[in-house]
Amino acid sequence: MTNMSNAISLDLGDDGILVATMDLPGKPMNVVNGDLMRPFADMVERLATDASIKGLVLTSGKADFCAGGDLDNISRIATAHQAFTVAEQLKAVLRRMETLGKPVVAAINGHALGGGLEISLACHARIVIDDPRLKLGQPEVKLGLLPGGGGTVRLPRLV
């Protein structure tokens, strides 16, 4: 098992399937911030360059898959240019993962909201636990924010 800065652990099986478990330290839920997305981008790069990896299963070590954007980080964005840069970086890593040519499956074990849902939408398939309390959604629209990772394109394509 490989640990990517404690936020994502990787386990490559004998079958060539890489299991990536998001488990952001110090947070009750995984949130989309630099501490998660830097190792996420490194994981996507490894998926792209390591021929022994045949596919990826992405899941969470927490009770929920991912709660979306880190509101503390979002509140520190001071300019439109900064907001644009953050959104473009997220879109770029998700688009890279989506177009690699290797299958990526999100194993959604709890709520996937906002950026967490966008991560799962960039996967080729999603498997969701059967729990009537589980929520998938983009609640940022209620705050006047647009989904920044490409979810406005991917979600309608799936529905």
PLM features per residue range, with description:
Residues 60-93, 112, 142-144:
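Glycine- (often His-adjacent) and acidic-residue-rich active-site loop
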Residues 61, 96-143, 147:
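Glycine-rich beta-to-alpha active-site loop
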Residues 152-159:
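Hydrophobic, secondary-structure "cap" segments at the distal end of domains
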Residues 20, 39-40, 58, 70, ...:
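Terminal peptide-recognition signature
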Residues 1-59, 77, 92-96:
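Conserved CoA-thioester-binding segment of acyl-CoA-metabolizing enzymes
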